[in-house]
UniProtKB/Swiss-Prot annotation:
The active site is at residue 52. It is an enzyme of class 5 (isomerase). Substrate binds at residue 111. The keyword DNA repair does not apply. This is tRNA pseudouridine synthase A. The lineage of its organism: Bacteria, Pseudomonadati, Pseudomonadota, Alphaproteobacteria, Hyphomicrobiales. It comes from Methylocella silvestris (strain DSM 15510 / CIP 108128 / LMG 27833 / NCIMB 13906 / BL2). It holds the Pfam family PseudoU_synth_1. The gene is truA.
Length: 248
């Protein structure tokens, strides 16, 4: 069966997350319904990242199999037509070999977390970032973030309902960059635990506000105790930006 790789962008606000769920409409369900609509097939797509409710994506990747071959541009355009008015776009479709897996072939996932740090309420960016009114020290946040780089037990920053077999992960990038009122937090790893990024970002916000010292971040990590986590950052500031694969 021909296999296709899809590059996907979406606004996560209206959805219960990427994965199909009984309690609401998911991104996966919307795309499967659209693909099934124009192909006449019952299809299943497999994503690289299972984003939570409210989390956005600019570079989600999925793979899907069909019983017949399609021109990639026809597949992309037909899928987008059937997806309207859902806030989901198939940016690219390409034919891949049968061994390719959007999830298991991935070697790195890149996330961006956006904070707007100002007293005034949000207008244009509402629902697209975390609005924090109290002044944040982005330099201290970046310093604290560096203590989490490398291979660690991230139990402190793991959701209590996380189903991963191991809390061990290798964090490859964790940078905090400020440009005026905008704070961007860039994170990269091969894989993440459930709510790991939002848990780490929420804890960094404690550092930025002065509630935590820089050293408290490393101490929270070392505790391997979920109760030592700071707040969990809201989902609307998180974006799955890119998924990397080994070049063929």
């Amino acid at each position: 069966m021909p296999r296709f790789k899809l590059l996907i962008e979406y606004d996560g606000a209206p959805f219960v997350g990427w994965q199909r769920q009984a309690n609401g409409f998911s991104v996966q369900e919307a795309i499967e319904t659209a693909l099934g609509g124009f192909t006449g097939e019952s299809v299943a797509i497999h994503g690289a990242g299972r984003t939570d409710a409210g989390v956005h994506a600019r570079g989600q990747v999925a793979h899907v199999d069909f019983s017949r071959d399609w021109r990639p541009d026809v597949l992309r355009d037909a899928a987008n037509a059937w997806l309207r008015p859902n806030p989901i776009a198939i940016l690219k479709a390409e034919r891949v070999d049968d061994e390719f897996s959007a999830r298991f072939s991935a070697v790195r996932r890149h996330y961006l977390y956006k904070i707007i740090n100002r007293r005034a309420s949000l207008t244009l960016e509402a629902g697209r970032c975390w609005a924090i009114r109290r002044s944040l020290d982005a330099g201290a946040m970046h310093e604290a973030a560096q203590t989490l780089l490398g291979f660690h037990d991230f139990s402190t920053f793991r959701d209590s309902e996380c189903q991963a077999e191991s809390p061990l992960r290798t964090l490859e990038r964790f940078d905090v960059l400020r440009d005026g009122e905008n704070i961007e937090i860039h994170v990269a790893a091969r894989s993440f635990l459930h709510s790991q990024v939002r848990s780490m970002v929420g804890s960094l916000a404690h550092v930025g506000s002065g509630k935590w010292r820089v050293e408290d971040m490393a101490e929270a990590l070392a505790a391997k105790d979920r109760r030592r986590c700071g707040v969990v950052a809201p989902p609307e500031g998180l974006y799955l930006m890119q998924v990397d694969y080994e070049e063929a």
